[in-house]
A protein has these predicted regions:
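C-terminal membrane module of polytopic membrane proteins
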Residues: 226-319
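Alpha-helical transmembrane segments in multi-pass membrane proteins
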Residues: 24-69
Length: 319
């Protein structure tokens, strides 16, 4: 590919990636206007709002996948995960959550000495608190449960289909895997908000995109995201629903144990990533060897057919 064509390819990839992010934002605004039109309080029915937003995003991303797929090959890579890959991904998810735990702890320490950081941490905690602007008493319990279910299992599908499937996918058309991972992670971080979120969102985006690349499977990043959300927010959000009457002491103990587990898993997560890197290299070598063997077999078969044809001609001449 010539220089101008390379530049055009890169520019096109960036513009398409930005378009995918615009679609993501526009879907959210569309759901917002629908709720506003029907005068549904988004704060009281936040679970229903977030669920509707995610379902609409998934539908939009399925359309993107269909539009970009060629023949029987899906635009989103959806290889079946092997058991060894699943184990590695679970360890990575725990380590990723441990990294975020350390990030928040460090931010809290900085906030003790820096006023602006203190305000940022207050804003952050309000943004992740389901009931920061609404009393639990006015929220239907079904919506609180739907909020948790959506957070744990639907959000990962919607965000991974957008940022790893679509954004990373179009970036790969113009860039190598490393730069595509970085750019998609930056986009992921920016759309999570330019505050305390952005730092760990970019770091998590790097890990999620890298695991998608290493496994050639969107299931990998979805699994990572699910485990992260379940242990990072889902468990606490479920246990703090007042109508379930779970004592705060039990909730605190569970969350402390989860935090300790994730911190303990961090060094093993590094090893798990190294394992996936080695596993990908092994798969590439194996696929290359199989392709070479298939090519050799095809050449051998063609040679045998040629020899048979020549022998047949010689036999006919003798007759």
């Amino acid at each position: 590919m010539s220089g101008p064509n390379k530049i055009a390819s890169k520019v096109s990839a960036v513009l398409q990636a930005l378009l995918m992010m615009v679609v993501f934002v526009c879907v959210s605004y569309l759901v917002f206007f629908v709720f506003a039109f029907f005068k549904i309080d988004r704060e009281i029915y936040k679970g229903a709002f977030n669920f509707s937003n995610c379902v609409a995003t998934i539908i939009a991303m399925l359309i993107v996948n269909k539009a970009n797929s060629t023949g029987k090959e899906s635009f989103f890579k959806m290889k079946k995960l092997q058991p060894n890959q699943v184990v590695a991904l679970l360890i990575i998810a725990l380590g990723m959550l441990g990294m975020v735990t350390m990030y928040i702890y460090a931010a809290d320490k900085i906030a003790e000495y820096l006023r602006s950081m203190q305000e940022a941490m207050e804003d952050y905690r309000e943004s992740v608190d389901r009931f920061s602007e609404t009393e639990q008493a006015v929220v239907p319990v079904w919506d609180s449960v739907l909020y948790v279910i959506n957070l744990c299992f639907v959000v990962p599908f919607a965000e991974e289909m957008c940022f790893r499937g679509a954004v990373y996918g179009v970036l790969r058309k113009g860039f190598g895997p490393v730069l595509s991972v970085i750019l998609s992670a930056v986009g992921f971080g920016i759309l999570h908000g330019v505050n305390v979120h952005i730092g760990y969102a970019i770091a998590c985006g790097l890990i999620l995109a890298a695991c998608y690349h290493l496994t050639d499977s969107l299931y990998a990043s979805i699994l990572l995201h699910m485990v992260f959300n379940v242990l990072g927010s889902g468990v606490a959000s479920f246990m703090t629903i007042e109508r379930f009457g779970i004592p705060s002491q039990i909730t605190n103990r569970v969350m402390v144990n989860i935090n300790l587990l994730t911190l303990f898993a961090m060094p093993f997560a590094v090893l798990a990533i190294a394992y996936l890197v080695n596993d990908r290299r092994s798969r590439i070598k194996k696929e290359a060897a199989l392709a070479e063997a298939a090519a050799f077999a095809a050449v051998t078969a063609e040679t045998e057919e040629t020899v048979k044809a020549e022998n047949k001609e010689d036999q006919e001449e003798l007759e």
